[in-house]
Amino acid sequence: MLKVSVLIPVWNQESLIERAVHSIPLRDDIEIVAVDDGSTDDTLQKLMMLREERNDPNFVIISLPENKGVGNACNVCLDSASGEYVVFLGSDDYFFTEAFEEAMQLLDGTDLVYFDLRVNNGDIWKLNKTSKKVFVGAVKFMRREFVGDSRCPEIRQAEDWFFYQDLMGKNPTEAFSGLTVKHYNFPRKGSLTYIANEEKEKDEWRRR
């Protein structure tokens, strides 16, 4: 039985996708679902090479004919997953492989299981109930049955913020492990313009 589906929405990351995939343990109970969102570089070819290299029957690659944004790509990932739990991996992020395997032992039916992460400057983000970082880039293993039909809005930025707000509205059971499982590429675009655009997306969504 597949325990975890690692979901990778990707667009034009041929130089970094290999690192992300190599960080995922090769195990019979782990599935990779990579959705190429209409890349114009060699990302799709790199994914196919990596699947052949791993010789992994649980490595699913889906190629979308045109770029529709990360929200849509995330939803295709969720629709295609088969594991008991799902976890997103940004194509420019990577797991700490041994810690990932330790984390799998803690998946005991809890709806959302959180793990700490490391960011670009080496800081460790410790996640807990009151942490504002819980919704941004956090390592969340999500029980797929609990996720149900919750999906990301098909917007260009901040789609995960709305997705996790939806999940929290379902009153999930939660656990915080303290394990550092992922390196998170943050800030991805540390400009004020990026922050302003993200807030604009949230405002537009609230008005719908």
Named regions from a protein language model:
Residues 127-199:
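Conserved nucleotide-sugar donor-binding catalytic segment
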Residues 94, 100-125:
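Conserved donor NDP-sugar-binding/catalytic core segment of glycosyltransferases
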Residues 86:
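Short aromatic/hydrophobic "clamp" motif used to bind/position activated sugar donors
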Residues 64-81:
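Glycine-rich, basic loop-to-helix element that forms the pyrophosphate-binding segment
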Residues 36-45, 66, 90:
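A conserved acidic beta->alpha catalytic loop
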Residues 9-16, 39:
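Donor nucleotide-sugar binding loop of glycosyltransferases
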Residues 13-26:
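Short, well-formed alpha-helical segments that are part of the catalytic scaffolds
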